[in-house]
Swiss-Prot record:
Binding residues for NADP(+): 503-534
Membrane-crossing segments per the record: 743-763, 777-797
Active site per database record: 661 (proton acceptor)
First-listed, main subcellular location of the protein, grouped into a coarse class: membrane
Protein name per its UniProtKB record: Uncharacterized oxidoreductase dhs-27
Upper lineage: Eukaryota, Metazoa, Ecdysozoa, Nematoda, Chromadorea
Bilayer topology term: Multi-pass membrane protein
Keyword vocabulary terms for this entry: Membrane, NADP, Oxidoreductase, Transmembrane, Transmembrane helix
Family: Belongs to the short-chain dehydrogenases/reductases (SDR) family.
Biological source species: Caenorhabditis elegans
């Protein structure tokens, strides 16, 4: 073999010079793609095939193999169709026509293929290359396909043009991670069941992208003939209605969708990373358009708040109690394909033909796609008309269709519109980034182009100002709402009548100081209750409290020493199960001595907190509630951590790891869900207090200035300055007005707004009159306004899905 190669190489050198020009001339006459590549410059890299599979020849054998094959091909003056199919490249990523034919399989008869043409569409996306492949058959028929492949070239070029700076080496790697996830998400979408009635391109083949191993590609229907609306124009109301008819199918399918959809398409946090890192681009855009600086200064801080984007994009609907719906995620001009007004026209009609580009599909806010579309694709006038007329109409249509389909829509019109307003904020802030990329922020040389840009900028900042105005209005209204509720609680709402419980026992855990002791004083001094059963861990404090109650108020007191942190729950007195208990106050609680997340706390501290703060309330309620139900009377008061309703970021580690450890609204879920299920108990009220919007650094309690100026009496009762780190939050019995008057705090705070935030926790209205209530259950918040830490942890949310308390106890005790 080696001698044959040497001989053939000698032969090839003899005819190479004289035959080269003739070969090129004859190749051009054949108009063959592969022959046009035969030049001295690119010859060493050419692909030559002798079978149906491609082979990359080694350089040592190249001269002979290349020229010998070329001589055989050109001397016969014919090219095999098979040869052309294998070698025709599709795009820049190593795919060929042979790959396409193999992927389509039985959809094509490869023996009847006469010619294959490939061209790049001029409307490539930012993160993909789009190729149109035309296959001609011997019977004069043609088939057209679109091949979509992921790449970073376009987005990189757009950013370089925008910033007028060359991207640094390795910048591609920053895009590839997120791009891989998004592209593979679209592949998975096309692999799922087709959503009835939703117009999307047909997908013939899709393969996932594994960078460095497998080229990602999607082969789909060619929508040639359809058009898109240019991004510098606006959709009209008829077009918005046509889009709504398709969203109707998507949202109707989302009601009761399978868990597989939720698992495959969770909300992509990469989207949060993208929108929260766009400040520099927007600043550059504003700097080149000075008329925007005043408006931008009002929202600049919002761009730097990643938590804000997380709330309004991912969590805004959850806090409203709305289920997840499927979202397209990128519903804007170039992903909406329209039927043209007439054949061959480039003007879009009012009939939507197809929705493309599903790489950002996810579960989330039902209004997300409407926010995106109305913000990015409509001028101010059209958007406001759509908000006032289209959105309510769409909700009614969805509700009617759900009834027809036999599905239950757990959504009110008020929830729907509130979900829209919340999500709209993020898209209004995102719009300048997209506009700057589309316009490349460089001032236009043409006056007409600059006029169009100014119109777009006007629409952009109108949307942004609407978002900011909405935010300010909500804050003001919340402040007024809090003040009105506070006045109602302290001056209008009557005290609860406790006379029917005077002959029953009041059981209090943690009643020797702080909140628990404040309850005892209120009950015995002003409510006439004389029977108390105290449970605490300090025998001296228990005896002192007992002595004080007996000598000063003539109370009957029983005590039991129990440390919820160390003692087993089974050691609690059994007589509690048969004792005639009228009021149960679960007040025992501890707090960590350091600020940190679950992973940052010392070993064993989390278990102690769970045991004291959670299991004490669970076990005490389990023991006492059945007898209350039997006697058809009773009150349960649970003191909960403020962080049960608001989670705090406590460290840099949390931000780096993108972790959020929400504490559990411990007694709230237990009493509103589990007790009702187990004991068929109805509740008079439940309290979900709002938390202060205060971002405090890691400080000791005594270093916080508001604490030094609080009235002494309030400080004594609340225990804010001291070991207990608690505050009186007595909603059921109401402390005297001189201690908790909402107006008494204002002079001790630097602003009325801060005062309102404090009042929103200390003095919320909880009384809701209802019918046929047997057991009254109150959930009260223990303040953590000045020290933010986690009393409870994320795993409690899963624990409370268990329906029986015995199962809960066994699980937790084995866990500890």
């Amino acid at each position: 073999m080696e001698s044959k190669v040497v001989a053939l190489n000698r032969e090839s050198r003899r005819w190479k010079k004289s035959s080269f020009n003739e070969l090129l001339k004859r190749a051009r006459n054949q108009k063959s793609t592969i022959c046009n590549r035969f030049t001295r410059k690119n010859t060493p890299n050419i692909l030559v095939t002798f079978t149906s599979r491609l082979t990359l020849l080694r350089p040592t054998f190249f001269n002979f193999a290349c020229w010998h094959s070329a001589m055989e091909i050109f001397e016969s003056m014919s090219f095999s169709v098979k040869f052309d199919k294998e070698l025709l490249p599709i795009g820049r990523h190593g795919l060929t026509a042979g790959w396409l034919i193999e992927s389509l399989g039985q959809l094509l008869n490869s023996d009847n293929i006469r010619n294959i043409k490939c061209s790049q569409l001029g409307t490539d996306g930012f993160v993909s290359q789009i190729m149109r492949v035309v296959i001609e058959f011997t019977n004069n028929q043609t088939k057209k396909y679109i091949v979509k492949m992921p790449e970073t070239t376009n987005i990189k070029a757009a950013l370089e043009k925008t910033t007028q700076q060359k991207m640094p080496e390795g910048a591609d790697e920053q895009f590839i991670g997120g791009l891989t996830m998004f592209f593979n998400r679209e592949v998975e979408y096309y692999a799922m069941e087709k959503i009835p009635g939703l117009r999307t391109p047909k997908c013939y083949h899709a393969q996932q992208w594994d960078n460095g191993k497998t080229t990602g590609a999607i082969v789909m229907q060619d929508l040639e003939g359809m058009v898109s609306v240019p991004y510098y124009e606006s959709l009209n109301l008829q077009q918005i209605a046509s889009i709504g008819s398709q969203m109707l199918n998507l949202h109707l399918f989302s009601i009761g969708m399978s868990d597989e959809w939720r698992q495959k398409f969770p909300f992509p946090m990469e989207l949060i990373d993208t929108v929260s890192n766009m400040t520099d681009i927007v600043k550059l855009y504003v700097s080149r358009n000075p008329e925007l600086e005043e408006g931008f200064s009002k929202v600049e801080k919002m761009y730097q708040d990643r938590e804000l984007f997380t709330k309004v994009l991912r969590d805004s609907h959850k806090s409203l109690g709305i289920d997840d719906f499927l979202c397209h995620g990128d519903l804007w001009f170039y992903n909406l394909m329209w039927i043209p007004r007439k054949s061959g026209s480039e003007v879009a009609s009012n009939h939507l033909g197809s929705i493309i580009d599903w790489q950002n599909v996810h579960t989330g806010n039902i209004c997300e796609d409407f926010c995106h579309m109305l913000t990015f694709c409509c001028d101010t006038e059209i958007r406001r008309q759509a908000e006032n007329t289209f959105l309510p109409y769409y909700y009614n249509q969805l509700k009617a269709k759900a009834v027809e389909a036999g599905k239950k829509l757990n959504l009110t019109l008020n929830q729907f519109l509130r979900a829209y307003r919340r999500n709209f904020i993020a898209h209004a802030l995102h719009l300048p980034f997209i506009v700057s990329i589309m316009l490349c922020v460089k001032p236009a040389d043409d006056e007409i182009v600059q006029k169009i840009r100014n119109q777009m900028s006007g629409a952009l900042w109108s949307a942004a100002q609407f978002a900011v105005t909405s935010y300010v209005c909500v804050r003001v209204l919340k402040f007024l709402y809090i003040m009105c509720k506070s006045v109602l609680v302290h001056f209008i709402t009557p005290k609860h009548d406790l006379d029917y419980l005077k002959d029953t026992w009041t059981v209090i855990t943690g009643g020797t100081d702080g909140i628990g002791k404040a309850y005892i004083e209120e009950l015995c001094k002003t409510r006439g209750l004389k029977k108390f059963y105290l449970i605490g861990r300090n025998i001296d404090k228990l005896n002192n409290t007992k002595k004080e109650l007996v000598e000063q108020h003539g109370c009957e007191v029983m005590c039991h020493v129990h440390d919820f942190e160390k003692d087993d729950l089974s050691a609690l007195p059994k007589d509690l199960e048969t004792l005639d208990v009228g009021i149960l106050i679960n007040c025992a609680g501890i707090a960590p001595h350091i600020i940190g997340t679950l992973t940052e706390l010392p070993e064993g501290l989390a278990s102690k907190i769970l045991r004291v703060n959670l299991m004490s309330a669970v076990k005490m309620t389990e023991m006492i509630l059945p007898n209350m139900v039997k006697k058809k009377r009773g009150i349960i008061v649970n003191i909960s951590s403020m962080t049960g309703w608001r989670r705090f970021r406590t460290s840099v580690l949390t931000r780096l790891a993108k972790l959020h450890y929400p504490s559990s609204p411990t007694p709230c879920q237990m009493n509103t869900e589990e007790l009702e299920f187990v004991f068929s108990v109805s509740f008079q009220c439940s309290l979900l207090p709002r938390s202060p919007r205060m971002k405090l650094k890691k400080r000791t309690i005594s270093s916080l200035s508001p604490l030094k100026t609080l009235p002494n009496k309030l400080s004594e009762l609340s225990g804010l300055i001291g070991k207990s780190q608690r505050a009186v939050c007595n909603m059921m019995f109401r402390l005297p007005l001189e201690h908790c008057s909402p107006f008494g705090f204002s002079k001790y705070f630097s602003s009325l707004l801060l005062c309102s935030e404090f009042i929103s926790i200390v003095l919320p209205l909880i009384k809701r009159r209802t019918r046929e209530r047997i057991i009254r259950v109150f959930i009260i918040s223990r303040l953590s306004i000045f020290v933010h830490f986690y009393h409870d942890f994320f795993l409690l949310n899963a624990i409370f899905q268990i329906k029986k308390f015995s199962c809960e106890l066994n699980f937790l005790e084995s866990f500890f």
